[in-house]
């Protein structure tokens, strides 16, 4: 593992997408260095940007444990904000392991990305044995990475250190496992979401693909057509909207100075 002094670490940028924190850089560390850097800076993942022949940049994403997810919605929005500020334009395209995405930088309070996929791969899974208060069935949907969505009357008192790993490693979702979202319906088109993230192996303040998964599952169940507001566990607000068959995720992005 390379030696990282405070001055070396300061060469990276720290971004937050609606509370989801990332280290962003244009040099690629070794996997063990990714784990170290994420631990030192207390972030959820590492974003590596490199030149691309088909987009403004290619984004390679690492979880804090060094694993590589194919997509991270808030990480992608952070990359879009970074590229917009570097290139001096608002229209940004990014190539990822999950495909080519386009986004738009309106302001630091509103960074949008088109998250549309041809197939969301939604499926219902029955849990024969489960701890309370998990329901008999959960929905799994693929929003670039797999997510299980559990709708419950109240989620603020849930112990995600128990319920999260139970579903994340459940044999139903083997061998790769899933991210797990616990969803509370606050009102029409208003959701509160808590997410246990695969690769972080814990709850995060927000999760973009999890917010998207939760909104898609609930809107399909209740027939909602309007934009859905997601109240994250960290207190930020995200919005999922649909227009002419396209699905958009938006929210704030901040950069630590």
Curated annotation (Swiss-Prot):
Homodimer. Belongs to the diaminopimelate epimerase family. It comes from Chlamydia pneumoniae (Chlamydophila pneumoniae). This is Diaminopimelate epimerase. The record marks 147, 197 as: Could be important to modulate the pK values of the two catalytic cysteine residues. The lineage of its organism: Bacteria, Pseudomonadati, Chlamydiota, Chlamydiia, Chlamydiales. The gene is dapF. The keyword rRNA processing does not apply. It catalyses: (2S,6S)-2,6-diaminopimelate = meso-2,6-diaminopimelate. GO terms for biological process: lysine biosynthetic process via diaminopimelate. Catalyzes the stereoinversion of LL-2,6-diaminopimelate (L,L-DAP) to meso-diaminopimelate (meso-DAP), a precursor of L-lysine and an essential component of the bacterial peptidoglycan. GO terms for cellular component: cytosol.
